[in-house]
Swiss-Prot record:
Cystine pairings recorded for this chain: none
This protein's name: Putative nickel-responsive regulator
Family to which the UniProt record says this protein belongs: Belongs to the transcriptional regulatory CopG/NikR family.
Needed co-factor(s): Ni(2+)
Protein source organism: Trichlorobacter lovleyi (strain ATCC BAA-1151 / DSM 17278 / SZ)
CDD domains assigned to the protein according to its UniProt record, in alphabetical order: RHH_NikR_HicB-like
Residues reported in the UniProt entry to bind Ni(2+): 79, 90, 92, 98
Gene Ontology terms: biological process: response to nickel cation
């Protein structure tokens, strides 16, 4: 972590009031922490858009395990990308549905491609990809 630098910003009072309500609702101790988090989030987003930065992500999906060969297809996809898939969690939600959460590491482009492939497999009811930086910025 580098030296702390103080700086001032000019902001519309209505926007500041909205921001203050937001940071109170989210439990921030002060504006500085909230602004630091916004800056970090923007930097992570830039890395995702670049496509070549190392990222980590989770793919969460729900599927009906009775769909023919679906579990085998999903497992095969994971094995095809064994360098990127670093962990998997499988949960039986009920007699028919399963939740699977995969943790992936690689470039954002690789992770997005793998997620698209998995979520596009026939029988996957729904799912979502969450990406973040594998190299966190300073606190």
């Amino acid at each position: 972590m580098g030296d702390i630098t103080r700086f001032g910003i000019s902001i519309d009072s209505d926007l500041l009031d909205s921001f203050d309500r937001l940071i109170t609702r989210k439990g921030y101790q002060n504006r500085s922490e909230a602004i630091r988090d916004l800056i970090r989030a923007t930097i992570v987003e830039e890395k995702m858009d670049a496509g070549h930065e190392e990222m980590v992500g989770t793919v969460t999906m729900v599927y009906n395990h009775h769909v023919r060969d679906l579990a085998d297809k999903l497992t095969e996809h994971q094995h095809q990308h064994h360098h990127q898939v670093i962990s998997a969690l499988h949960v039986h939600l009920d007699a028919h549905n399963c939740l699977e959460v995969l943790v992936l590491k690689g470039s954002s482009a690789e992770i997005k491609q793998i997620a698209d492939e998995l979520l596009g497999v026939k029988g996957v009811k729904h799912g979502k990809l969450f990406l973040t930086s594998a190299t966190p910025e300073h606190h």
